Each structure stands twice: as C-alpha cells, then as structure tokens.
UniProtKB/Swiss-Prot annotation:
Summary of subunit composition and partner proteins: Binds ribosomal protein uS19.
GO biological process: ribosomal small subunit biogenesis; rRNA processing
Residue stretches making up the PRC barrel domain: 97-171
Protein name per UniProt: Ribosome maturation factor RimM
Gene Ontology MF terms in the entry: ribosome binding
Pfam family name, one: RimM
Organism, scientific name: Geotalea daltonii (strain DSM 22248 / JCM 15807 / FRC-32) (Geobacter daltonii)
Length: 174
C-alpha cells in the first residue's frame, strides 16, 4: 500500500488559458476526474523543490484540464508556471475500483507473458480513446506495444511490480 505522503506526477502546465490566470493542463493520470477533486497541487520549481498551491477550480476542456489557482487572477501571475510539472499527494487521488490503476502505479512494472517470459519494463502509456496501449521496452531498441484489454492483461500486481499478459498471436512479429 502506498503512503499518503507519496507524490505523483499527474500532469504538466501546457499553456495559459484566457487572461484570468487559468492554466491549461495536460493530464498524465489517464483519468480527467482525478483533477476535479484536488484541493491543492505541487508545482515543481525550475531549480528543484516543490511549491504547493491551492486549487480554486478544475474543469475538463476537451482533452485538457483548465486549472484555476487561488490567488492567481491574472495571466501575468501564471506565465512563469507554463512548462512545469504538476504533482499531488497520493491521499488526494480518488479511490479506484478493483482492476483500475493510476498510470503512475503501472509505469515501471515488469511485463511478462503467462509462460513467464520477461518482455521488459512498462515505460509509457498511450491513450487512444478506445483503449490504452502500454509501451514496453525490452532489451536494446526493442519496443512492444500492448493493448490494455481484459483478454490481454491477465494480472497486475503493483506490490510485486509486475504485469502478466497474454499476447495476441503475431504481436511480437510486428
């Protein structure tokens, strides 16, 4: 079980939005709703360290999030935040149902076949709309794209740090 004090990267400030100090956020969480319940965010400073800022409002805007911070009401107040990463404490994230995971819990898992063959490390997740696709780096330059489907992903064990998959026939030949 993860500690409530653990920080997780959930997005990045991609731009300002309007002139009233709002920020356009690219979400890395895979779940837009996780932003809606946030009370505060931590924004990474250029030299390291974190700055905790109170959230006034977060709302979906297409595939982005529009984030308003308390005390920031003008575009000039937030220009310096563009390009920075956004983190949250684990205890601020909504609880998920069984079989659901935050991307930050999946990244870094060792991916193996049901026969025990190690495919590599899950290094990225691509959101395609219909289903996510897991990017797994094997040895060398080998990259495997695995669809995140119930009949492909057999087991996820975040405590043990592994994911077991049943690859569609011919996937490794691509």
């Amino acid at each position: 079980m993860s500690s409530g004090n653990q920080t997780f990267l959930i997005g990045k400030v991609s731009a300002t939005h309007g002139v009233r100090g709002q920020l356009r956020i690219t979400s890395f969480s895979g779940d837009m709703d996780s932003f809606m319940a946030l009370r505060s965010v931590m924004i990474k400073k250029p030299g390291g360290g974190m700055e905790t800022l109170a959230v006034a409002e977060a709302k979906a805007h297409g595939k982005k999030i529009i984030l308003s911070l308390k005390g920031y009401t003008d575009i000039n107040d937030v220009l310096h935040l563009v390009g920075r990463e956004i983190y949250v404490l684990r205890d601020q994230l909504p609880l998920l149902s069984d079989g659901e995971y935050y991307w930050c819990d999946l990244l870094g898992l060792q991916v193996m076949t049901e026969d025990g063959d190690i495919l590599g490390e899950l290094v990225d997740i691509i959101s395609t709309g219909s289903n996510d696709v897991y990017v797994v780096h094997g040895g060398g330059d080998k990259e495997i794209l695995i669809p995140a489907l119930d009949d492909v992903v057999l087991d996820v064990d975040t405590v043990a740090g592994r994911m077991t998959v049943s690859l569609p026939e011919g996937l490794l030949d691509l």
